[in-house]
Amino acid sequence: MKPILPLLLRRSLLASLLVPIISLSFSASAADFMVDASQYSDPNNNIYSTLEELVSSVALVAGDTVILNNDDASLTTGLTVPVNFRSADPAALCAVDLSGLGKNPLYNLGAGEYTLEMDSVIWSNGAAGVIRTADDNVSLEITGEVQFLNNHVDNSNNSAYGGAIDMEGDHATLTLGNNATFSRNYAFSSSNYSSSSSSGGAIAMSGDYTTVTLEDNATFSGNYTFSDSTSHLSNYPSTSFGGAIYMEGDHATLTLGSNATFSGNYTFSKSGTYSTATTATSSGGAIYMRGDHAMLTLGD
């Protein structure tokens, strides 16, 4: 029998889970918060006019669910705890514009196990991607019909990875449910004084024994990587890999469910002087996997 904790104790325990002991799992909702621009904020009833007002209130704890009644472009602060998001009407997608976050992602997750609901939500215009991890042993499952639109990483210091999602570390796992959509996300890197590289316009995974699983009807369109190491003075190499998905490391596994669609994804590189481009490499317009014993499985 699954033990049931009192609400107060349960919320206290969830709030303390930023320090992992064995694993972190946030699949259960602790409380619901509503974002509704048509209403005045009423914190006592968990109602907020904007998403930024809710995040700034520090009322959210790990496992809470944010219910969106409308599009929102208010965020200037990234999330410090992993919470769920869903549209109040599953038939009406709600778009969250992340441009106000600047060079910060929405989620920056540490080691642990996460299950996040993102149902009928569009994440758009993030300038540092949407989700980033940099630890070993991170497991992230995203449920619901989620879209990633026009997100990017723009790095003028040699390299850029994962326009929407970037996971760096061994034994990292990413799973997305049915109908996940990635459109017009990109990774761009430039340098006039050294080599540059960009990898994974939509998704980048770096590390050994990493796994990406996309369930049925995944769509990748118009995602790209672009590297530019053009210089007035000399030739510097420029590389660009995986317009949609990039995986680097031994024993990497990519599994795509039925009816996955890739269209208009590409890679592009420029290098050398403005009159020559002899050391530019672009590979994997849709998918690029690099490492020993890599495995790609395609559905019907």
Where would I find each of the regions flagged by the language model?
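Bacterial N-terminal signal peptides
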Residues: S12-L24
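N-terminal secretory signal peptides that target proteins for export/translocation
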Residues: M1-L9
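Acidic Gly/Asp/Thr-rich repetitive segments characteristic of extracellular carbohydrate-active
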Residues: F33-I67
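N-terminal extracellular ligand-recognition/capping segment immediately after the signal peptide
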Residues: E52, G63-N84, P90-K103
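Solvent-exposed loop/turn tips at the surfaces of repeat/solenoid architectures
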Residues: D71, V83, A88, L101, ...
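Extracellular beta-strand/beta-solenoid scaffold signature
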Residues: L98-L109, S124-D135, Q147-G169, R184-S206, ...
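Well-ordered beta-strand segments characteristic of repetitive beta-sheet solenoids
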Residues: V66-L68, V83-D89, L106-N108, L116-M118, ...
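Sec/Tat signal peptide C-region and signal peptidase I cleavage site
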Residues: F26-A30
